[in-house]
Each structure stands twice: as structure tokens, then as C-alpha cells.
Amino acid sequence: MIMSGAALRASASAREASQGRRSSLTRSRVRSAWIFIAPTLVVLLLIAGWPLARTIWFSFTDASLNSLNDYEFIGFENYLANYDGEWLGLLTDPDWWRSVWNTVWFTAVSVSIETVLGTIVALILNASFPGRGIMRAIVLIPWAIPTVVSARMWNWMLHDQFGVINDLLLRLGIIAAPITWTANPDTALWAVVMVDVWKTTPFMALLILAALQMLPGDIYEAAKVDGVHPVKVFFRVTLPLIRPALLVAVIFRALDALRVFDLIYVLTSNSRDTMSMSVYARQQLVDFQEVGLGSAASTLIFLIIALLVVVAMVAGQVRLSGETR
């Protein structure tokens, strides 16, 4: 049946009216969303945006902790400057680059181990067994303990004279003499990684467990009926399905690891062999009272983290919503 011109015009008018109502509803929802989110944005600007802007500004000055109101604008001299043919500044400081390497190494190793262990723990906790709820609560205890408390606790456990770790290894005959875990350059950073893995693996397990619980159960029933090996089910079914959530968890955890401060500072203080970028910035700002140089280090930390976030999101092709492109 062929529609008349009047009917076509009426149909088009109805579609336009419907689209207009949807557009008006969308605009209303957007306005409501902005109204609700505006207070949060204002608070974020006050507690995060303003300090960040001040830090970036101070990085271009010669401000010191003794005279925060008496400083001069010096441009990029805190970052890189040439005086009588000699290059000076943050980018020429070997301690800065050592702290960058320590931070990147710590992040890569700790996040990798935590992701693997967190996945294993999440798979175990996702299974059905008696006392599963209690076990889930127990697993979260290390993550719930404040970082400083965890670091002090492990500092005593790793003590070369009174620590339980050395005592146990000596009794088992694994070592012949006590090891200075946090003072030895060969073991200090590994000790920090070990403590961080103990504390943060439950966090990764929690995020991965949440992703596992959202998976449909019928695919596993089908795999069980077909007699597919559980290992193959994990790599062919489970891992691809939780990949977006896993990538988001890795990004969030890497962000946290890149700004590590308290764990390293409590365990090893200002040791050059374990100094992170945040510890270096604190040393310049507090110990040396160089606000300009400390602010420059903090600004570079911000830029490095921001760059790595962009790279990770592009490489993993993951949106913050957890959907892959």
C-alpha cells in the first residue's frame, strides 16, 4: 500500500516531534547531571586543582621553605640550566634518574606479581566452598591495614637481628647468616616489593573477583558438558571476558605504585638504592628546603603518570567504562 503525501508529512512530523522530545529530555538530564556534579567539581578544584597549579608555579621559581613569600621567577632553571658551560638542574641529577628507575622497576615488578596472584586468589574465592564469605573477609585484612602500620610491622619482621624472617630461614638452614633485608642494596627493593605484594594483592583480587562474578554461568556449564579442561576454559573464556576489567585494575594499581612514598620511606628511609620519585621530591622539599626543585620533581611525577595513563589506555584500548573499542 502506497502512503499519500499527507500521510508521509504527518509521519515525518511525528518523528520530528518525537526526536524533539527526546532531545529536550536529553538536555534536561545533562543539565541535572551537571547540577549534581558541580559541587564535586568545585571541591576537586579546591583540594586538587589549586595545589597542583601552585606546585607547577613554584617549579618555575627559586622559592625555599624558609622564605615562601620571597622568591623570583627563574623559568626552567629548576629543570635544566646552563651555567658557564655546565648543565645543572633536575634533569641532570643522577639521583633523580635513579629514583625514576627505582619507581618504574618497582611498579612493573609489583603490579605484575600482584596481577597474577590477585587473579589466582580471585579464582579461588569465586569458587563455591564452605566458609567462602569468611575467607573473603580474611583475605582483605592486609589491604585494610594502613600502609605505615604494615611497613613498621614488616620492618620488625625483616630486622637482621630480631626479625622472625631471618630466624625462620636460619632454623631451616636456608641462610647461614642474618640478612639485612632493608639495608642491603641487593635486597632492599625486593623487600619493598614483597611487602607491597602482601598488602596490595587483596585489592587486585577484589577487583578481579567483581569481574568474575559478572560472567554468565551458562558458558561454564557448556564447557563442563563438552569436557573442556579448566585451564583451557580460563585462557579461552574467562581471561578474554575479564580483560577490560583486568586492564582497568592494572592501570589503577600502576597509578598508585608510581606515586609510592610511605612504604619505601618507612622501610628504607632516604636510601638512594630504593628512593622513589615521591621520596626524592620530599627530600628536596623538606630535607634540603628547596621548594622550587621539589615542586619541579612533583610536576615531573604528575606529567610522567599522566603520560603513562594515556599510553596504557591507548595500548590496552580500554575506556574507563570498562568497554573495549
What are these regions (language model features)?
Residues 29-325:
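A structural signal for multi-pass alpha-helical bundles of membrane permease subunits
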